[in-house]
């Protein structure tokens, strides 16, 4: 297997596109997990792509949430990617991975969608350890304009920013943004949080993907007020879908986040049908915030333990 990093992420993405272009994780999303205590390795097969994860218990978010319920002592199987609706291929890849593991130690399979969970249950006895919301997906045009009755409160915030601040505000994108100035804002934003340690992994990810921002692979949008950065968004366009990796604002400026989000989507992603704001990091407050924007649908995924 090859360990995933920035040198081979494009190779993995190309293969994902060939197998299932509607797959809701990009190679960069898989790579981002390495900053949260989960190093992903992958292998190409005729039937698809298999994944193993090596868990760092000191940094892994899921272990932090589940504690003793999730303490893997060997590699964890992550849901393979196959052609859509191919349960036999999916289960064959799972079988091959289980055979590589020690059945005297706990065997976990993570990241199963509801359909994939049923496939696995048809062949194996499993215990569901955890359910998570991994993808909050929105109609791009809807959250770009904040249209409709359900988003009236968000639109009110946007209109407030436009009325109170827009004349002294500015949007800059990509290379127009001074990354050193941006990082200073980011560090200040983190240090002002209730728990700055919760964002150290995300900060490390931001620093690692700077080259992708600089070469235009990732899209950067920064919001300035009186020439000072008060918010930014890092996003990615793939297969008619926008993925938002990082998004933060100084929300003491009412409506700043709505203004940033609207402009980021309008500038970079107006042709992407869906916007994926990714997972809720196991945080009730993040989940509440993402739900308040009325997603079109949410993808639930499951971690299971195989009963040998």
Swiss-Prot record:
InterPro entries: Acyl_CoA_acyltransferase, LPG_synthase_C, UCP018688. It holds the Pfam family LPG_synthase_C. SUPFAM superfamilies: Acyl-CoA N-acyltransferases (Nat). Coiled coil: none annotated. This is Uncharacterized protein MYCGA3080.
